[in-house]
Amino acid sequence: MPKKVFIKTFGCQMNEYDSDKMSDVLHAAEGYENTQNIDEADLILFNTCSVREKAQEKVFSDLGRVKHLKAKGVLIGVGGCVASQEGEAIIQRAPYVDVVFGPQTLHRLPQLLASRARLGKPQVDISFPEIEKFDHLPPARVEGASAFVSIMEGCSKYCSYCVVPYTRGEEVSRPFEDVLVEVAGLADQGVKEVTLLGQNVNAYRGSMGGTAEIADFATLLEYVSEIPGIERIRYITSHPNEFTQRLIDAYATLPKLVNHLHLPVQHGSDRILMAMKRGYTAMEYKSTIRKLRAIRPDLAMSSDFIVGFPGETEDDFEKLMKLVNDVGYDTSFSFIFSPRPGTPAANLADDTPHEVKLKRLQHLQATLDDSVRAISASRLGTVQRILVEGTARKDASELMGRTECNRVVILKGQPRLIGQMVDVRITEASQRSLRGEVLTQDDTVAA
């Protein structure tokens, strides 16, 4: 009977990708199978995120809940950014943990577990071995028609509030051909949509074969779009400071590039953006969007926002709200600033009361919600191209898919539509999802 692994993932799409790779590595090396039932697991892994406040405490809280399973011989591991940040401190506080590993050493997980068994003591490896992990990962196992592909690791921007450069290291790009081979392999398995991942994908600089040539992100997009079977290309996350004209032009020449862009702005005040060390102004950010929408007028935008950064005044906040209203976002993520240990912003004086920050956040979120509702309503009666991903969560007799702009659509249809592209007329619109009717010849409604 195969051993089973339970993986709990926190945070971003990079962590989701890394969790899939942990599963692939363990399956290839030890035959592990995934389980959603923690009580039947032989190995429990927490793939952690350190971006938000109290991330470390959440990890130790989860560890405490599974400590009793050690009596059954269950192994426990902590990976991800909290592991990278805390390292040996995790073992000191939770000595029942067997392995601690960072985002760049997940490929060594089988060796760490073997060393734990051989030496009889916890193992820690949170080093930064450049891009080595991609050389040791087995071919991806995929289910469904969409997949993530990591094209680079780390970030070299060192925004004043962000812990990512310290937990994932500086920017390192995968070789150009390696990315193309992985995408082609996924296409051979039936994948129609790929999401290219990185902390800052538009900083991609991949070596091309044995030459001295370097491929930038726009070049990578061009080549990925030529791979047979791939019908949609997404990417996340990009940085406004490196959104080149070549990348903007790609929206005119690459129809497979979806009509959705997540471009984190963080704030709308130039003074706050400078304190954040973002490297651009609100006007420069909006200029990029104007250029993009000149090419794709209906381009759906999403973003990240931080409210209550140290020193934020009411005037700063009003400038943020102006930017939000000027752009018109279709879904976004917004948070109250939380200081991350070891970052420059953690040492900034902050005299804004929490109640004021909360009120500002609520105002921002209400405005963003209004924008989402208006955009949803504008979709009524339109025909949208949907990638059907599976059955709907609330009703297994219905199907669920996504539009190019990443909006969930519920529809009726036979299970054979799963994994297919279908045209759907939108008949209902709510804030977070749409409902539609299939228009193609495959429209055989399930009985």
From Swiss-Prot:
Q: Cite the SMART domains for this sequence.
A: Elp3
GO molecular function term, any single one: N6-isopentenyladenosine methylthiotransferase activity
Record carries keyword Repeat: no
Q: Which UniProt keywords apply?
A: 4Fe-4S, Cytoplasm, Iron, Iron-sulfur, Metal-binding, S-adenosyl-L-methionine, Transferase, tRNA processing
Domain (Radical SAM core): residue spans on this chain: 141-374
What cofactors are annotated for this protein? [4Fe-4S] cluster
Q: What class of enzyme is it?
A: transferase
Residues of the MTTase N-terminal domain: 3-118
Its name, as the record gives it, is: tRNA-2-methylthio-N(6)-dimethylallyladenosine synthase
Organism of this sequence: Polaromonas naphthalenivorans (strain CJ2)
Report the gene name: miaB
